[in-house]
Amino acid sequence: MSAARADRLVELLAERELDSLLVTNLLNVRYLTGFTGTNGACIVSRDERLFFTDFRYVEQARDQVPDFERIQAGADMLRDVAKRLRGRAGFDDDHLSVASFTKVSETVPDGVELVPAGGLVEGLRAVKDDGEVAAMAAAAELSTGAYDSLRERGLAGRTEREVAVGLVRFMEDAGAEGPSFPPVVASGAHGALPHAVPRDVEIPRDTLVVIDMGAMVDGYCSDCTRTLATGSPPDDALELYELVRRAQQEALPAATAGAECRAVDRVARDIIDAAGHEEHFGHGLGHGVGLHVHEAPRLGKTAEGTLEAGNAVTVEPGVYLPGSVGVRIEDLVIVTGGEPRILTGFPKELVTVG
């Protein structure tokens, strides 16, 4: 698998007239090599596949990185890597710090030209293969199970933080490597903060609760948001919920191969804007998910590009009324040539959990 990915990267290098690419971002390194450790880098060129790590990971790399020449680096690994660059050498400028770039530029052999080439590996990562989709589907199933567990345990009377900790424990007990991000559990007015941090505050009855969470399986993430009810929320909160649900329902089938990313966003945004909430939907409709919970492509008002079959994206409209209430509904989907495949299975009709 890693050999095929490196081969595709070499094709991109030829299109950019690059002789090689220095990859330092650990998720990109993992995608290309299979390495899961915390210190590694690689160089990919037409003639070489070089992987560098330190003493701690030599044995691990022997098992995980069969398709690259493995090199044990010294105390200053980046300088050891830089010495092996040749010709027009691209580097992932989205991730390499100024200090690290300075070190590389001071060390490369004479005649090497360093060329910013960020986004090349991320572009490959954006289109998932069957194995990646399977891992993400498994992760999504775990988060669906965590939502189901709330039907039994309820929400009212428990603190937001208690619920968040319980959701993580459920997913890990069910086989997750861990959460793909710290869960959001936000009740009432706290739900108007899109990335609210769970508080040591009891969740009241007769309110809406925004819960955003995901699991990680084989390094791949899921991401799902549901807004749940305790008791009988007020009518205006229920109307807001139905607005967001309708916006998401209309946007989902628009997420198809060939669709402009900004056009998919527009489907949901037009519905929310028409209801008078233009100022209350301030984030994009969605984002890619994979080895990281936020990656390419992006669905938003100014997003560039079009969707491709195999993209894994979220579709997550939300409306947030400061000091009052928030609603977000999010699914993780796989883009196809027709209707997207929805990985997140918990119901979207308003669920009351007590």
Enumerate the predicted regions with their spans.
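Active-site neighborhoods and metal-handling regions in enzymes and metal-associated proteins
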Residues: 1-354
